[in-house]
Regions:
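A cross-family acyltransferase "interaction/gating" segment
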Residues: 41-42, 76-80, 84-148
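Gly/Ser/Thr-rich phosphate-binding loop
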Residues: 15-16, 308-320, 429-434, 443-513, ...
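Conserved ATP/PPi-binding loop(s) of AMP-dependent carboxylate-activating enzymes
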Residues: 518-525, 533-568, 604-607
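AMP-binding/adenylate-forming catalytic core of the ANL superfamily
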Residues: 432, 552, 557-558, 573, ...
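Conserved AMP-binding/adenylation subdomain of ANL enzymes
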Residues: 363-381, 391-430, 445
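Conserved AMP-binding/adenylate-forming
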Residues: 215-257, 380-388, 605
Length: 712
């Protein structure tokens, strides 16, 4: 059988040889463009085992396949030996997409082998090369011959990686509070730099304030859950850290939510008390605040404790071991599957759903993000401006700096472009994540981009990064924006683009880490399955659009208060995102949009998001992250099927020539005329959700009402 490991070092090669029946049962295949490392090549030259070297470019696909069949017919396993290409840290595989695609549509079955290399410490818990603490080799079930065999092999690797990570020493019996205390005391002089008042708080003092806050929480509430209504800043970090230390479930509230959404979240989570800040309640007056008696003003409470108590706890931390300090502070020891926090979905299609996040999920999320970043503890600085009610805000803005030993710079407003640019330049920030609207504000304030030159990673989170914004950042400022794809159910992201690795050795093959239109490769520990639009079964052609399903240690398995039997989005260990996308042979994920944002026209699926971009071009209008000008929805047709409708703020009234403009604009772009909306409806504004995404349900109901279509 054809055996396809994701990566191989000499130790793995020898173990594989044993597992497959010894050297008389194995033939090794080496492809010249991605040859194995020096140790393997020396071993092959010394032992002269059965096998062959080839070059697809020079000898052609047919020749290579004939050599594979020759050894298979002789009763041997043919094992592909991947090389050591340049790519992102902790990548899934060392096999380039073109080499995997070699076996597509052939009569060859394949057995994927996933080789996992792990360390017992946080900074490099997942690695791809020596040295490592432990090696796991998983022989996956054979993949049947046929179309897109290479992409199906990738899917098997991802599932095997998830199974291995579940047994990682850090995740099998995690104690997140203990790890946080140990990490902070290991880097006590790291600082939280507050961008509002330019104050600095050492992590040792931050831990002391969090320990004091655990007592405040216990005094005010005996409930298992507590709400946190705070923006990014030192009080938000202290409150979330205190909840983890106290074993209390933190529910970070979206303070841009509507009153109806806020009431729904409070009832769903069963909240009675909320941690906040006096200044923030005065600033955020439009928010539907709870009664004052239900609010815990953390700034006032800590002020009443006195600075002497803070200094006492800080002094205690200097002379006690982490275990002694935890015992003295009565730090909780929660189980790995105890709920640490609750996030809520954005409510794009329905009311926000509560997502319980366990301690194991949080730690797995931080590990997967840390392993993908080439940052140095003790000198690199992270910018924290994404609110903690978003998974990226909690994981990347709070836990990653604390566990990784990085300074963090906080600021409460993600769209304060001028101030954020100044903070990035002042503190030489290396990592920043922001929403597309916040990024646009930063680029506008940056002028020539030099103030952002220290950024090694500039991630776009929260909503889709427009091609126009990404290209403008690259062309005008020389800044690569890294698109990510996330959901509230998968922490911190499902996938993220990464910068290309430095290439001092130009002869080494470089695997893609980002591509226009893609959201990058799935993070370590996230398995992606592409299915049909109406079935949870894996697609035989994952490189064609289908529903995106996920599983992994940082992916939820349930919703708050909803059994899995009542949720069509949960199927075994898999979670359905409701998004449509596909995987490329080189492991990059493309997300096309929500399932509801596609219209079925015969055999064709028309993506609304892509159609909206085309309509903006037809009307020569620039997209605005803060105010939508148009939206496309799908409504039932009176003759059966579906019809496309364009809601437009660009029209006060619609005349027949408007339909011709759209129709000719679509066909001039070599698209079918069926892409032209059947109806154009003038509206005063396009409804959006607090997270900035389209309020599709309101748009749909409004379109049906205007067209007098009755809904069940």
């Amino acid at each position: 059988m054809l055996v396809v490991p994701n990566r191989v070092d000499l130790t793995t090669m020898l173990e594989l040889e044993k597992a497959l029946g010894g050297k008389n049962r194995v033939a090794w295949m080496v492809e010249a463009s991605v040859a194995p490392g020096e140790a393997i090549m020396n071993h092959l030259n010394q032992t002269r085992p059965a096998g062959f070297s080839c070059s697809i470019n020079q000898q052609g696909r047919d020749y290579v396949l004939s050599r594979v069949r020759q050894y298979l017919e002789a009763g041997r396993h043919v094992v592909l030996l991947p090389g050591r290409p340049l790519q992102s840290p902790a990548s899934l595989a060392d096999v380039p997409g073109y080499l995997l695609s070699l076996f597509d549509s052939t009569p060859l079955h394949a057995m994927p082998v996933y080789v996992g290399m792990y360390n017992h410490y946080f900074d490099a818990a997942i690695t791809t090369c020596e040295p490592y603490d432990c090696l796991h080799i998983s022989l996956c079930p054979p993949v049947r011959a046929g179309h897109q065999l290479g992409t199906r092999v990738q899917a098997a690797w991802m599932s095997a990686q998830v199974a291995q990570l579940q047994k990682h020493p850090l995740l099998e019996h995690p104690n997140l509070p203990q790890m946080l205390v140990e990490a902070i005391l290991r880097h006590p002089e790291r600082r939280l730099l507050d961008g509002v008042d330019d104050s600095a708080l050492a992590y040792r003092d931050l831990l002391s304030a969090a320990v004091m806050t655990t007592g405040i929480i216990e005094r005010h509430s005996a409930a298992e859950r507590i709400g946190i209504i705070l923006p990014p800043g030192k009080l938000g970090v202290i409150a979330n850290l205190a909840c983890l230390l106290a074993g209390v479930t933190a529910v970070n509230i979206n303070y841009t939510a509507t009153p109806e959404q806020f009431d729904h979240m409070v009832k769903t989570a069963g909240l009675t008390r909320f941690i906040t800040d006096t200044r923030f309640t005065n600033m955020q007056r439009q928010f539907s605040w709870p009664r004052s008696r239900d609010l815990i003003y953390l700034d006032e409470e800590l002020g009443e404790q006195g600075s002497w108590k803070l200094k006492a706890w800080s002094a205690l931390g200097k002379w006690r071991t982490p275990q002694q300090l935890m015992q003295h502070a009565d730090v909780a020891s929660p189980g790995p599957d105890d709920v640490a926090s609750i996030h809520f979905t954005g409510g794009t299609e329905d009311k926000p759903l509560g997502v319980p996040v366990t301690h194991r999920m949080l730690l797995a999320a931080v590990i997967s993000m840390r392993c993908r970043l080439q940052l140095g503890a003790g000198h690199d600085v992270l910018l924290s401006v994404v609110p903690a009610y978003m998974p990226a805000g909690l994981v990347c803005g709070i836990l990653l700096p604390l566990l990784g030993g990085f300074d963090m710079v906080t600021y409460p407003m993600a769209a304060a472009g001028k101030r954020l640019c100044a903070l990035v330049q002042q503190h030489a920030v290396a990592f920043a994540a922001n929403t597309p609207a916040g990024i646009r504000a930063m680029l506008k304030a940056a002028k020539d981009g030099r103030c952002l030159s220290s950024l090694q990673y500039f991630l776009s989170v929260g909503s889709k990064l427009s091609v126009e914004l990404a290209e403008a950042a690259q062309q005008h400022y020389g800044i690569q924006l890294l698109e990510s794809y996330g959901t509230a159910e998968a922490l911190p992201f499902v996938a993220a683009s990464m910068p290309a690795p430095a290439a001092p050795e130009t002869t080494r093959l470089m695997l893609p880490t980002a591509r226009k239109g893609c959201v990058g490769a799935p993070l370590p520990g996230v398995a992606v399955r592409i299915t049909g639009l109406y079935t949870p079964e894996p697609s035989a052609t994952p490189s064609r659009p289908g529903l995106i399903w996920l599983k992994g240690p940082a992916v939820t398995r349930q919703y708050l208060g909803i059994s899995n039997e009542d949720s069509p989005r949960m199927h075994g260990n898999w979670f359905c995102t409701g998004d449509v996308g596909f995987m490329s042979p080189d492991g990059l994920l493309t997300v096309m949009g929500r399932r509801v944002r596609f219209t079925q026209m015969g055999d064709e699926m028309i993506p609304h998001v892509q159609l909206e971009e085309i309509l903006y071009k037809i009307y020569n209008v620039q997209q605005d992250d803060n105010e939508r000008k148009l939206a496309v929805v799908s409504v039932p047709s009176r003759t059966g099927g579906e019809e496309l409708v364009m809601l437009s703020t660009l029209h006060k009234e619609v005349i027949p020539s408007d339909y011709l403009t759209v129709r000719y604009g679509v066909t001039n772009l070599h698209l079918p005329a069926s892409w032209a909306p059947r109806h154009i409806l003038p509206v005063k504004y396009i409804p959006t959700l607090p997270n900035g995404k389209l309020d599709y349900q309101t748009c749909f109901v409004g379109a049906c009402r205007m067209l007098k279509i009755k809904l069940d």
